[in-house]
């Protein structure tokens, strides 16, 4: 009879997760396995595109999304269990080196014709959806801002044909360094990583009137995979939440 270890070696738990969760889920997977769980095979990408892959028949054990809607949709379609919020994030602005911008001047700078505003791709990637929510808030402060930002925003990441970064690099760091964008709207966790990689790049907080929060949810797609439900519980455990906090996310238990 094959041992549990050899069975795990033959049948790893497959986890699909949002790209912004790469560092956190990779760390959690290693911790989960070292604590006696099966090895974890991860696939990272835009949440909307991962959800489409599941709808077309792919079966990860667990799907962790950068929003609530994609896992909820799978649950409504009968393709997974319920969606459970496990972390929160926020939208920040990543400023390229030499771009003079503060939280107070952010909206005015983004509206300037010469400033290139980068975003992810709406519907394919929740980060893009959150950017457009910010544009809607901007319109309430400055009528016409939505139309301007909607027209000028450069959808540089999160799409089916979006460029991939070199191994070990943040795509946001690459795009900012190449000046594909002067200001990039992305998750604060992504912006912080990119700023660490790019000399002179800065993370700019988004003012409260424009602030957009992001709730991350997971769902068990295939409970028959070894450790699927255990991994979901591990993400929600004290250790899992500690790892998320270390990567800049707000744990679900935080006030």
Over which residues does each language-model region extend?
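N-terminal signal peptide c-region/cleavage motif recognized by signal peptidases
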Residues: 2-6
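Exported/periplasmic ABC-transporter solute-binding proteins
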Residues: 8-58, 65-68, 72-76, 87-89, ...
């Amino acid at each position: 009879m094959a041992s549990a270890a050899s069975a795990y070696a033959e049948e790893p738990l497959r986890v699909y997760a949002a790209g912004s969760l790469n560092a956190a889920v990779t760390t959690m997977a290693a911790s989960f396995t070292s604590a006696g769980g099966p090895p974890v095979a991860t696939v990272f990408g835009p949440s909307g595109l991962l959800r489409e892959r599941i709808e077309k028949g792919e079966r990860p054990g667990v799907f962790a999304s950068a929003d609530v809607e994609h896992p909820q949709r799978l649950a409504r379609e009968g393709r997974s269990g319920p969606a459970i919020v496990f972390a929160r994030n926020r939208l920040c602005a990543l400023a390229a080196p030499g771009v003079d911008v503060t939280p107070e001047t952010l909206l005015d700078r983004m509206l300037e014709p010469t400033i290139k505003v980068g975003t992810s791709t709406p519907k394919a990637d929740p980060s893009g959806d959150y950017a457009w929510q910010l544009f809607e808030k901007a319109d309430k402060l400055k009528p016409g801002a939505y139309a301007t930002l909607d027209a000028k925003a450069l959808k540089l990441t999160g799409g089916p044909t979006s460029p991939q970064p070199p191994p070990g690099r943040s795509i946001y760091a690459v795009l900012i360094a190449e000046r594909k964008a002067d200001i990039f709207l992305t998750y604060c966790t992504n912006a912080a990583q990119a700023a660490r990689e790019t000399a002179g790049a800065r993370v700019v907080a988004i003012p409260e009137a424009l602030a957009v929060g992001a709730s991350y949810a997971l769902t068990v797609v295939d409970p028959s995979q070894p450790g699927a439900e255990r991994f979901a519980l591990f993400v929600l455990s004290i250790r899992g939440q500690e790892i998320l906090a270390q990567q800049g996310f707000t744990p679900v238990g935080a006030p």
